[in-house]
């Protein structure tokens, strides 16, 4: 079978890469240990609901559903699996699951062993997870399996003339909860009709984050009564733009949470900033008020820090692509980003709603910021548009909960 051959080639490639690189080496080791973990830690008397996410982003989409089920149905235990180290390494101690491990490669032998040991009573695959052997085995055993926050496009293999056989895997799902009408219509063209348009659970997730945002006394003290600009996940090319403007505008304060927190990058930022600046890890209630720029030199705070800003900037738009715009928009503040945003649906929608703003360089940025700083009504209107966009698109979680039987 061609599919299995591709999987074995991929597995071989990862093992070879693991000889030279730490990330695939972690992956190989983690996949090898899965079966011992399941044998030793699975409670054979419990009923498990299994959630699978390829990586961290997909996990965050599934997280609202995990936490709702855990809250309303504590009689079930949660098994969370990841395919990549970038998800597993960050969330291996996630308290919302009873067991977190890797998902082994989709070979027939791995699949039989994994499903036998895990023995789930229900399964949720998040977004783009369509592992043929796993799905066929779960279907064969009569285990209801759902696709959550999935999205389909015409160029995917399922809708090509040569993908008819692979498209059969979509029929193994008990139901598909898709993000938009286009996905539902595409699936209908190949006869897949157990589909409901629910939207994207990421909107529910960022609302949860907003409601649970940490109080950060040092950031609050730093802000005081000043208009504060929060730059999240920034890269050097982003910082060249907004730091230049900040240096020339003493009426505003700046919080920078760089994407890469390294000594060399932090030194680069400090060299660019020409006003009093302090690192978060060195800040105290006494010295933080003397600074105009606060550099967040640790991880895990950004989603809570946006609440202290009047204007936000999301990095990556002058490089590989922008980062999470929803984490800022949920607080009802305008979101600025660079030009590499075309593949990010939320950014495109924010642009349409006038809550997001694209800048292609310093001149664009300066014109926009001058407008924000001189026109309070314009600033408030943009922030309201961003917040409304998130609120109006939330609700996927409730629709999913109504359609599953627990």
Residue ranges and their predicted role:
Residues 1-406:
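Nucleotide-activated sugar donor-binding and catalytic core shared by glycosyltransferases
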């Amino acid at each position: 079978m061609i599919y299995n051959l591709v999987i074995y080639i991929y597995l071989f490639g990862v093992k070879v890469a693991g000889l030279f690189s730490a990330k695939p080496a972690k992956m190989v080791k983690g996949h090898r240990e899965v079966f011992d973990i399941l044998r030793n830690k699975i409670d054979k008397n419990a009923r498990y609901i299994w959630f699978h996410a390829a990586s961290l982003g997909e996990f965050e989409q599934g997280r609202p559903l995990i936490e709702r089920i855990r809250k309303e149905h504590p009689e079930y235990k949660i098994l969370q699996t990841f395919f990549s180290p970038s998800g597993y390494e960050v969330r291996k101690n996630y308290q919302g699951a009873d067991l977190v491990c890797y998902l082994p490669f989709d070979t027939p032998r791995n699949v039989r062993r994994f499903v036998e040991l895990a023995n789930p009573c229900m399964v949720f695959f998040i977004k783009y997870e369509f592992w043929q052997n796993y799905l066929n085995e779960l279907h064969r055993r009569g285990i209801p399996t759902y696709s959550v926050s999935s999205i389909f496009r015409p160029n995917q293999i399922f809708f090509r003339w040569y993908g008819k056989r692979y498209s059969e895997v979509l029929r193994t799902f008990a139901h598909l909860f898709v993000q938009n009408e286009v996905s539902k219509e595409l699936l209908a063209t190949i006869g897949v009709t157990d589909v409901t348009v629910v939207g994207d659970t990421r909107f529910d997730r960022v609302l949860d984050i907003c409601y649970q945002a940490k109080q950060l006394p040092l950031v609050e003290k730093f802000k005081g009564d000043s208009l504060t600009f929060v730059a999240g996940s920034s890269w050097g090319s982003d910082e060249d733009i907004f730091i230049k403007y900040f240096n020339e505008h003493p009426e505003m304060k700046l919080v920078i949470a760089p994407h890469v927190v390294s000594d060399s990058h932090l030194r680069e930022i400090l060299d660019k900033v020409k006003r009093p600046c302090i690192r978060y890890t060195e800040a105290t209630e006494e010295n933080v008020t003397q600074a105009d720029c606060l550099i967040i030199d640790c991880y895990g705070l950004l989603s809570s820090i946006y609440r202290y800003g009047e204007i936000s900037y999301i990095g990556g738009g002058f490089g590989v692509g922008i980062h999470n715009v929803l984490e800022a928009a949920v607080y009802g503040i305008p979101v600025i980003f660079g030009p590499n945003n075309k593949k990010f649906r939320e950014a495109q929608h924010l642009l349409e709603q006038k809550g997001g703003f694209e800048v292609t360089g310093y001149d664009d940025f300066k014109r926009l910021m001058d407008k924000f700083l001189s026109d309070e009504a314009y600033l408030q209107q943009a922030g309201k548009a961003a917040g409304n966009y998130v609120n109006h698109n939330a609700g996927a979680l409730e629709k999913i909960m109504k359609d599953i039987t627990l």
